[in-house]
Amino acid sequence: KDEECPVIVERELLTFDVSEFPRSHYESREAFLSYSGNVSAEYTFYNPEDYTVTATLLFPFGKAPDYGFQYDTVTMEECFGADTEKYGVTVNGEEIEKTLRHTYAADDFELERDLAKLHDGYADDPFYDPDMPVTRYTYTAGGIDPELDAASAGFRLSGGGGKTKVYMEDSSGYNRLGKELEISAWVNNGVQVDVYMIGEQPEELPDWYICEDGSMEERTEGEMTLTDVEEMTFREFTMMSYDTDSHISETDWYNAVIYEMNLYEKSFGFIESFFDKLDVSDTLMRWYEYEITIGPGGRITNEVTAPVYPEIHGESNPTYDYTYLLSPAQTWKEFHDLEVVIRTPYIMRESSLEGFEETEDGYTLAADSLPPGE
């Protein structure tokens, strides 16, 4: 971490235990946590130097599955991350401490980009800061013809967005109109719309108008009345959906929200809203973070075990696609032998790696270097 690590990976034994497939839906926490699919990576590390090396390692193992059971609506108990508690990290057979980390992961994994998302604290951002002021303006719709079932409220932004960002819950669309950006939301009488102004507050508040439908072409009667104003810090704003009882650290959550907001920022500082109250819990890559120490000329065996979930395709005759991220191992100074063992009673239809041989209890593959890809 922060400098080149001299440690060599002499061998990795990668074992997939796929004795059962997950269900497409779970009715209870207990049923979900009883799923046994896991992946184990056993490394033999060698330190060729004449000094002791202490290294912080990061092991990504994917997002929580959308068919998982993360929140019990009956007991109101948070389950997010509970599936990692039965697995651990060992060095020479002794369990060591690990920390569960999270990064924003709406896209496919890219090594350099996704490693850069991990921070020891709040991420430094050219615009956002935890103490930055945020004001929420709540507007209530009224005076709209009740016969209009697709009425929309809109206002326009101008300027470069360098001093102020605008986030609106439930925005239904936006449209570039010359040097302005039109933002709209579906409304009917009594509907409330929250607009968040982040950073420097504008001299003038939004000048709303009502249109007959989402095309925003024909204006009609109606108004948006300012009914509430609330001030907060940007950190408080990012934490609107954060659960303090979750396995996610506050800073990892904050950094994920920032990444999302930068990703979905449009013209004039407008941030498109895809997630209710900035809830990023379904888009987080999970990592184990832990520390190892190897003496001069020393070797250790380090084993990491984590749950593994496939993507499920089809219903009547489903296929199950498993992905393991090999690319992070490219960061080692040297990587020698890799052995992959898949313990399963099922048939493997295809693999991105060539050379698997069938065995009595599954499949195996041996390589004298790290294969490209995942």
Give the ranges of each region predicted by the language model.
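Lumenal/extracellular ectodomains and adaptor appendage modules
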Residues: 1-374
